[in-house]
Amino acid sequence: MNMIDFEYDGIKLSSLKMSISSFSDPDDEQELGNNLELVNVKGQFADSYFSAGYSYTEPYQLEFYTTKYNCDNYDDFVISDAELNTLIRWLNRKSYCKFKPIYNDGSFADVYYMAYFNMSLLKAGGDIVGLRLTLNCNAPFGYQETKVFNGTLGSSPLTIEDVSDEIGHLYCKTTITVKSAGNLTIQNSADKYNAVIIKNCKENEIITMSGDTKIITTSMDSHKKLPNDFNFNYIRLVNTFSSRTNTFTANLPCEIKMEYNPIRKVGLVI
C-alpha cells in the first residue's frame, strides 16, 4: 500500500501532471501520528504512578516529495514558472482544506485530513524539478467521511455502532423533528448520565443541535425560551474498548437524523 496521488480541496495532484516521489529508503519507518502524552500522578508514599489525564503532543505532520510527470513526454520534467505559481496557489493556503490520500490498492478511500502545506523547491542544474511538501494537519489524526443515520424514535429504537478509532465520545450534528408536543427526553444506552432533555416542544417543531459548536436552534419562533428548556446535554456517540453500540430511545415520537465523522488513526503511507 502506497500513496500514488492525492486530492486537495477537490483537485488531484495528477491533474496538474505531478506525481508523488520518494528520495528515501523505501523501508524507512514512517510515523502514524497520534502521539499521546499521559499526565502522571504519584501519591506521597506510593511507588507507582497513575494517569490523571492525557493530551496529544502535536498535530499530524508528514513530509514528502512531488515531481513532474508527463506521460506524453518523459523529457518534460522541469517545472515552469507558471506551473510553480499554480502549485503554490493551490497548496500553500492560509486555511485548512480537505486532503484525501489516494493509494495504489484503493485502501482508506473514505479517509481524509484537514490540512495546509508548506513547501520548498528542489533544483537540478538551475531548474526547478520538484517540491518538498510538508503536510500540516489540524489534528493528530484523520477523519472518515460523514456517516448519516436516520430513525423514528418513540416507536422503535435507533442503534448505531460507533466505528471511530478513538475510545471516548464524539458529538453529532443532530436534527430532530418532534411529532407530538411535550417534554422530550432522548436517552443513549451507552451514555446513561447524559440524557437529552428539551421541554415545551411543539408538534412538528424541528430542532437542530451541534455538540461541537454548542449551538441549538428551532424552526418555531414561538419556542423563544428554547435555551431555558434545554439541559445542554448534546447528543453524542460513545465507545469503549469492549463496546461500540449506542441505542437511542425517546419518550415522544420524533424523527431523528444524526451525522458524524469517525476519527481514523491510520496515518499516511508514502
For each predicted feature, which ranges?
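Short beta-strand and beta-hairpin "edge-sheet" elements
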Residues: 96-140
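Long, hydrophobic/aromatic-enriched structural stretches that serve as scaffold segments
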Residues: 58-104
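Solvent-exposed loop and beta-edge segments used for protein-protein assembly and interaction
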Residues: 54-60, 91-93, 125-129, 166-170, ...
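Oligomerization/assembly interface segments of phage tail-like spikes and tubes
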Residues: 41, 47-77, 127-141, 246
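A short, compositionally biased
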Residues: 1-3, 91-97, 179-181
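Polar/acidic, low-complexity leader/linker segments enriched in S/T/G and N/D
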Residues: 1-40
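Intrinsically disordered, low-complexity segments enriched in serine, threonine, and glycine
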Residues: 143-270
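Short amphipathic beta-strand/extended segments with alternating polar/hydrophobic composition
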Residues: 13-19, 109-116, 194-201
